[in-house]
């Protein structure tokens, strides 16, 4: 990827949620990270100061809204506000992982908020001119924003690693649930139309354990589970057990966003999973970094190239043309 020789019109700032990723993006772009103070007052309120001139600059702010979600979202909002008040030309909110994305509907008409829309409206209202994110939980979330959204996909990065690590001779792509079939089918197609399997979870009746039915032939295969995020890893680990029981020789998972909350690490360490490959949209905890089953890929090059294309008015969608 060509580096940006002239930084006068492009600046990259970072919140505290994932500074290592921002540093990697800046390295790929050949620019330095913008100078800012992002901290908290003694009572916990956000404190932000932009420490250099940004007047008429095209600014990108990198901040995933991962845990602690409310704090990281608020931090993003006040950084954007500080930049807008400093007379930037435009601000793009680069949100590698968009938290609250699973709260995108009212389930069974319960009296609950659609929090994904609340967060999107806040980001739009504060003055963001554009949003750049990776693998939204649901593509329709783009419509919650009142500004343009570039939802880019980590699949090229994951596919390249699958080709390198496992080849395509004896693999089968597996969707861990019916809702992920479209994603899994697309991955299978890009891997040379490899076989596809689906795990159908259902509870036969009340007070009876959930049964996992495997749709597809996994016996003797290396199973590649694909999904957009892993949280407690309960479903993922149960899927690995079901696949091994049905004759799979190896079970690996490729997942974009490593939320990894609650009992996730215990579940993974004690699971039948042979490997879990994730990206750095969310920083890993110390326990996750030390886990021998977890391997992390970087989305820095993907985000840097997308930022470059946005800054120079080039096509983003052409990144995904075969």
Swiss-Prot record:
Q: What is its main location?
A: cytoplasm
The record, for SUPFAM superfamilies, names: PRTase-like
The record lists its disulfide bonds as none
- InterPro entries, per the entry: PRib_PP_synth_CS, Pribosyltran_N, PRibTrfase_dom, PRTase-like, Rib-P_diPkinase, Rib-P_diPkinase_bac
**Cellular component annotations (GO), alphabetically ordered:** cytoplasm; ribose phosphate diphosphokinase complex
What PROSITE patterns does UniProt report for this protein, alphabetically? PRPP_SYNTHASE
The places in or outside the cell where this protein is found are: Cytoplasm
Q: Which residues bind Mg(2+) 2?
A: 177
Q: What is its EC number?
A: 2.7.6.1
Q: Where does D-ribose 5-phosphate bind?
A: 203, 227, 231-235
For binding ATP, which residues are annotated in this chain's numbering? Answer: 43-45, 102-103
**Source domain of life:** Bacteria
SMART domains, per database record: Pribosyltran_N
Q: Which family does it belong to?
A: Belongs to the ribose-phosphate pyrophosphokinase family. Class I subfamily.
What's this chain's function? Answer: Involved in the biosynthesis of the central metabolite phospho-alpha-D-ribosyl-1-pyrophosphate (PRPP) via the transfer of pyrophosphoryl group from ATP to 1-hydroxyl of ribose-5-phosphate (Rib-5-P).
Q: Kindly provide the name given to this protein in its UniProt entry.
A: Ribose-phosphate pyrophosphokinase
Gene responsible for this protein: prs
């Amino acid at each position: 990827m060509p580096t940006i020789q002239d930084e006068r019109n492009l600046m990259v700032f970072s919140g505290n949620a994932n500074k290592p990723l921002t540093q990697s993006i800046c390295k790929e772009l050949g620019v330095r990270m913008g100078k800012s103070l992002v901290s908290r007052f003694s009572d916990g309120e956000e404190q932000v100061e932009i420490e250099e001139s940004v007047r008429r600059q095209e600014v990108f702010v990198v901040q995933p809204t991962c845990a602690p979600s409310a704090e990281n979202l608020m931090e993003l909002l006040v950084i954007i506000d500080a930049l807008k008040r400093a007379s930037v030309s435009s601000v793009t909110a680069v949100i590698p992982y968009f938290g609250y994305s699973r709260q995108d509907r009212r389930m069974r008409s319960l009296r609950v908020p659609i929090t994904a829309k609340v967060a999107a409206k806040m980001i739009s209202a504060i003055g963001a001119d554009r949003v750049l994110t990776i693998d939204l939980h649901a593509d329709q979330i783009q419509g919650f924003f009142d500004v343009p959204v570039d939802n880019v996909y980590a699949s090229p990065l994951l596919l390249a690693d699958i080709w390198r690590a496992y080849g395509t001779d004896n693999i089968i792509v597996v969707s861990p649930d019916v809702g992920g079939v479209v994603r899994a089918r697309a991955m299978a197609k890009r891997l040379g139309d490899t076989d596809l399997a689906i795990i159908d979870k259902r509870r036969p009746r009340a007070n009876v354990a959930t049964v996992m039915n495997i749709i597809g032939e996994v016996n003797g295969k290396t199973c590649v589970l694909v999904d957009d995020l892993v949280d407690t890893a309960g479903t993922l680990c149960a899927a690995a057990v079901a696949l091994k029981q049905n004759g799979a020789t190896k079970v690996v998972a490729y997942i974009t966003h490593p939320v990894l909350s609650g009992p996730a690490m215990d579940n993974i360490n004690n699971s039948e999973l042979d490997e879990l490959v994730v990206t750095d949209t969310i920083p890993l905890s110390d326990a996750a970094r030390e886990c021998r089953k977890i391997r992390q890929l970087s989305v820095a090059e993907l985000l840097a190239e997308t930022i470059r294309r946005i800054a120079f008015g080039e096509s983003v969608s052409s990144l995904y043309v075969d």
